Protein backbone atom coordinates (compact mmCIF):
# COMPACT_ATOMS: atom_id res chain seq x y z
CA UNK A 1 0.00 0.00 0.00
CA UNK A 2 1.40 3.38 -1.01
CA UNK A 3 1.61 6.15 1.63
CA UNK A 4 -0.97 8.93 1.30
CA UNK A 5 -0.18 12.47 2.36
CA UNK A 6 -2.17 14.66 -0.01
CA UNK A 7 -4.41 13.84 -2.93
CA UNK A 8 -4.85 16.45 -5.65
CA UNK A 9 -6.98 15.55 -8.61
CA UNK A 10 -9.92 16.09 -10.88
CA UNK A 11 -13.32 15.22 -9.49
CA UNK A 12 -16.42 13.64 -10.93
CA UNK A 13 -19.80 13.93 -9.25
CA UNK A 14 -22.28 11.07 -9.10
CA UNK A 15 -25.22 12.79 -7.34
CA UNK A 16 -27.04 9.67 -6.17
CA UNK A 17 -27.87 8.71 -2.58
CA UNK A 18 -27.77 5.21 -1.12
CA UNK A 19 -25.52 3.71 -3.79
CA UNK A 20 -25.12 0.12 -2.69
CA UNK A 21 -22.25 -2.25 -3.31
CA UNK A 22 -24.20 -4.19 -5.95
CA UNK A 23 -24.56 -0.98 -7.94
CA UNK A 24 -20.86 -0.26 -7.46
CA UNK A 25 -19.95 -3.71 -8.78
CA UNK A 26 -22.53 -6.41 -9.60
CA UNK A 27 -22.32 -9.85 -7.99
CA UNK A 28 -21.21 -11.62 -11.17
CA UNK A 29 -17.85 -9.86 -10.92
CA UNK A 30 -17.15 -11.23 -7.44
CA UNK A 31 -15.77 -14.60 -8.48
CA UNK A 32 -12.22 -13.28 -8.65
CA UNK A 33 -9.76 -12.67 -5.83
CA UNK A 34 -7.42 -10.52 -7.93
CA UNK A 35 -8.06 -6.78 -7.70
CA UNK A 36 -6.79 -6.00 -11.19
CA UNK A 37 -9.45 -5.79 -13.88
CA UNK A 38 -12.34 -5.02 -11.54
CA UNK A 39 -12.64 -1.53 -13.03
CA UNK A 40 -14.48 -3.13 -15.95
CA UNK A 41 -17.39 -3.93 -13.64
CA UNK A 42 -17.53 -0.58 -11.83
CA UNK A 43 -21.07 0.86 -12.06
CA UNK A 44 -21.53 -1.60 -14.93
CA UNK A 45 -25.34 -1.32 -15.07
CA UNK A 46 -25.08 2.47 -15.39
CA UNK A 47 -21.92 2.86 -17.47
CA UNK A 48 -23.12 0.68 -20.34
CA UNK A 49 -26.20 0.59 -22.54
CA UNK A 50 -28.02 -2.72 -23.24
CA UNK A 51 -26.00 -3.15 -26.45
CA UNK A 52 -22.74 -3.00 -24.47
CA UNK A 53 -21.67 0.46 -25.59
CA UNK A 54 -20.81 3.22 -23.13
CA UNK A 55 -23.72 5.31 -21.90
CA UNK A 56 -22.74 8.88 -22.89
CA UNK A 57 -25.04 10.36 -20.25
CA UNK A 58 -23.40 8.60 -17.30
CA UNK A 59 -21.14 11.06 -15.42
CA UNK A 60 -18.02 8.85 -15.51
CA UNK A 61 -18.31 8.50 -19.29
CA UNK A 62 -18.39 12.21 -20.07
CA UNK A 63 -15.18 13.66 -21.58
CA UNK A 64 -14.64 16.06 -18.68
CA UNK A 65 -14.51 13.11 -16.25
CA UNK A 66 -11.48 11.53 -17.93
CA UNK A 67 -8.67 11.05 -15.43
CA UNK A 68 -10.76 11.89 -12.38
CA UNK A 69 -9.25 10.54 -9.16
CA UNK A 70 -11.80 11.86 -6.66
CA UNK A 71 -15.42 10.68 -6.70
CA UNK A 72 -18.10 12.82 -5.05
CA UNK A 73 -21.39 11.08 -4.31
CA UNK A 74 -24.49 11.19 -2.12
CA UNK A 75 -25.05 10.07 1.44
CA UNK A 76 -24.89 6.46 2.64
CA UNK A 77 -22.41 5.54 -0.07
CA UNK A 78 -21.48 1.85 -0.16
CA UNK A 79 -24.50 0.47 1.66
CA UNK A 80 -25.66 -3.10 1.10
CA UNK A 81 -23.48 -6.20 1.25
CA UNK A 82 -19.99 -6.24 2.72
CA UNK A 83 -18.18 -7.12 -0.54
CA UNK A 84 -14.63 -5.78 -0.48
CA UNK A 85 -14.67 -5.84 -4.29
CA UNK A 86 -16.55 -2.51 -4.20
CA UNK A 87 -13.60 -0.41 -2.97
CA UNK A 88 -11.26 -2.59 -5.04
CA UNK A 89 -13.19 -1.69 -8.21
CA UNK A 90 -13.17 2.02 -7.40
CA UNK A 91 -9.43 1.93 -6.76
CA UNK A 92 -8.74 -0.15 -9.88
CA UNK A 93 -10.64 2.46 -11.93
CA UNK A 94 -8.26 5.11 -10.65
CA UNK A 95 -10.09 6.71 -7.76
CA UNK A 96 -7.96 7.60 -4.76
CA UNK A 97 -10.72 9.11 -2.61
CA UNK A 98 -14.50 9.24 -2.31
CA UNK A 99 -16.23 12.27 -0.81
CA UNK A 100 -19.76 11.87 0.57
CA UNK A 101 -21.95 13.10 3.44
CA UNK A 102 -21.89 9.58 4.92
CA UNK A 103 -20.68 6.06 4.23
CA UNK A 104 -21.86 2.60 5.15
CA UNK A 105 -19.58 1.47 7.98
CA UNK A 106 -18.40 -1.77 6.36
CA UNK A 107 -17.62 -0.06 3.05
CA UNK A 108 -15.72 2.67 4.86
CA UNK A 109 -13.64 0.15 6.80
CA UNK A 110 -12.91 -1.92 3.69
CA UNK A 111 -11.85 1.21 1.80
CA UNK A 112 -9.49 2.33 4.54
CA UNK A 113 -7.84 -1.10 4.62
CA UNK A 114 -6.81 -0.87 0.96
CA UNK A 115 -5.81 2.79 0.85
CA UNK A 116 -8.96 4.26 -0.70
CA UNK A 117 -9.69 7.39 1.35
CA UNK A 118 -13.34 7.93 2.37
CA UNK A 119 -13.86 11.63 3.13
CA UNK A 120 -17.03 12.46 5.04
CA UNK A 121 -18.29 16.05 4.76
CA UNK A 122 -21.40 17.88 5.90
CA UNK A 123 -24.44 17.65 3.63
CA UNK A 124 -24.21 21.39 3.01
CA UNK A 125 -20.61 21.04 1.80
CA UNK A 126 -21.61 18.19 -0.50
CA UNK A 127 -24.43 20.30 -1.93
CA UNK A 128 -21.97 23.13 -2.60
CA UNK A 129 -19.52 20.77 -4.31
CA UNK A 130 -22.27 19.53 -6.63
CA UNK A 131 -23.04 23.12 -7.66
CA UNK A 132 -19.34 23.97 -8.06
CA UNK A 133 -18.84 20.96 -10.31
CA UNK A 134 -21.88 21.84 -12.41
CA UNK A 135 -20.35 25.27 -12.98
CA UNK A 136 -16.85 23.92 -13.60
CA UNK A 137 -16.58 20.24 -14.61
CA UNK A 138 -12.77 20.58 -14.68
CA UNK A 139 -12.77 21.25 -10.93
CA UNK A 140 -9.73 20.07 -8.98
CA UNK A 141 -9.66 19.42 -5.22
CA UNK A 142 -6.81 18.84 -2.78
CA UNK A 143 -7.29 16.53 0.18
CA UNK A 144 -4.68 16.90 2.93
CA UNK A 145 -4.81 13.74 5.02
CA UNK A 146 -2.28 14.91 7.62
CA UNK A 147 -4.31 18.06 8.33
CA UNK A 148 -7.64 16.29 7.63
CA UNK A 149 -8.68 19.11 5.33
CA UNK A 150 -10.30 19.39 1.91
CA UNK A 151 -9.26 22.57 0.09
CA UNK A 152 -12.22 23.91 -1.90
CA UNK A 153 -11.81 25.87 -5.14
CA UNK A 154 -13.04 29.06 -3.45
CA UNK A 155 -10.20 28.93 -0.92
CA UNK A 156 -12.13 27.54 2.01
CA UNK A 157 -10.86 24.55 3.96
CA UNK A 158 -13.23 21.87 5.21
CA UNK A 159 -12.27 19.48 8.01
CA UNK A 160 -13.08 15.76 7.77
CA UNK A 161 -12.90 13.05 10.46
CA UNK A 162 -10.75 9.92 10.46
CA UNK A 163 -9.68 7.66 13.31
CA UNK A 164 -6.06 7.88 14.44
CA UNK A 165 -5.15 4.27 13.57
CA UNK A 166 -6.45 4.46 10.00
CA UNK A 167 -4.77 7.83 9.53
CA UNK A 168 -1.43 6.41 10.71
CA UNK A 169 -1.69 3.41 8.38
CA UNK A 170 -2.56 5.56 5.35
CA UNK A 171 0.16 8.12 6.03
CA UNK A 172 2.78 5.37 6.41
CA UNK A 173 1.48 3.09 3.66
CA UNK A 174 0.89 0.06 5.86
CA UNK A 175 -2.16 -2.14 6.23
CA UNK A 176 -3.28 -3.71 9.51
CA UNK A 177 -1.00 -6.73 9.07
CA UNK A 178 1.91 -4.49 8.19
CA UNK A 179 1.31 -2.42 11.31
CA UNK A 180 1.26 -5.58 13.44
CA UNK A 181 4.53 -6.78 11.93
CA UNK A 182 6.10 -3.42 12.76
CA UNK A 183 5.34 -4.15 16.41
CA UNK A 184 6.92 -7.63 16.35
CA UNK A 185 9.90 -6.65 18.52
CA UNK A 186 7.69 -4.92 21.08
CA UNK A 187 5.36 -7.93 21.19
CA UNK A 188 8.31 -10.31 21.71
CA UNK A 189 9.68 -8.08 24.49
CA UNK A 190 6.30 -8.02 26.22
CA UNK A 191 5.95 -11.79 26.02
CA UNK A 192 9.46 -12.24 27.43
CA UNK A 193 8.66 -9.94 30.34
CA UNK A 194 5.32 -11.64 31.03
CA UNK A 195 5.93 -15.39 30.79
CA UNK A 196 2.86 -17.59 30.82
CA UNK A 197 2.43 -19.73 33.96
CA UNK A 198 3.41 -23.36 33.51
CA UNK A 199 0.37 -25.63 33.29
CA UNK A 200 0.53 -28.41 35.87
CA UNK A 201 -1.68 -31.42 36.48
CA UNK A 202 -2.80 -31.99 40.02
CA UNK A 203 -2.93 -35.65 40.99
CA UNK A 204 -5.60 -36.78 43.38
UniProtKB/Swiss-Prot annotation:
Gene3D superfamilies according to UniProt: Aconitase, domain 4 (3.20.19.10)
Keyword Lyase among record annotations: yes
Major enzyme class: lyase
Pathway in which the depicted protein is active: Amino-acid biosynthesis; L-leucine biosynthesis; L-leucine from 3-methyl-2-oxobutanoate: step 2/4
Chemical reaction(s) catalysed: (2R,3S)-3-isopropylmalate = (2S)-2-isopropylmalate
This enzyme's EC code(s): 4.2.1.33
Record-level Gene Ontology MF annotations: 3-isopropylmalate dehydratase activity
Keywords, comma-separated and alphabetical: Amino-acid biosynthesis, Branched-chain amino acid biosynthesis, Leucine biosynthesis, Lyase
Keyword Amino-acid biosynthesis applies: yes
Top-rank taxon, per record: Bacteria
GO annotation terms (biological process): L-leucine biosynthetic process
GO cellular component: 3-isopropylmalate dehydratase complex
Annotated InterPro entries: 3-IsopropMal_deHydase_ssu, Aconitase/3IPM_dehydase_swvl, AconitaseA/IPMdHydase_ssu_swvl, IPMI_Swivel, LeuD
Quaternary data: Heterodimer of LeuC and LeuD.
Function text: Catalyzes the isomerization between 2-isopropylmalate and 3-isopropylmalate, via the formation of 2-isopropylmaleate.
HAMAP family for this protein: LeuD_type1
Membership in a protein family: Belongs to the LeuD family. LeuD type 1 subfamily.
Name used for this protein in its record: 3-isopropylmalate dehydratase small subunit
Amino acid sequence: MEPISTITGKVVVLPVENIDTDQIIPARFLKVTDKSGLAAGLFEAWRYLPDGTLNPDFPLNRPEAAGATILISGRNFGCGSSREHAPWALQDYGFQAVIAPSFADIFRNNALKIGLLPVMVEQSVYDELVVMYANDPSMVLTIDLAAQIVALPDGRQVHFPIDAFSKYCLLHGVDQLGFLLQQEAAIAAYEAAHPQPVQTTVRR
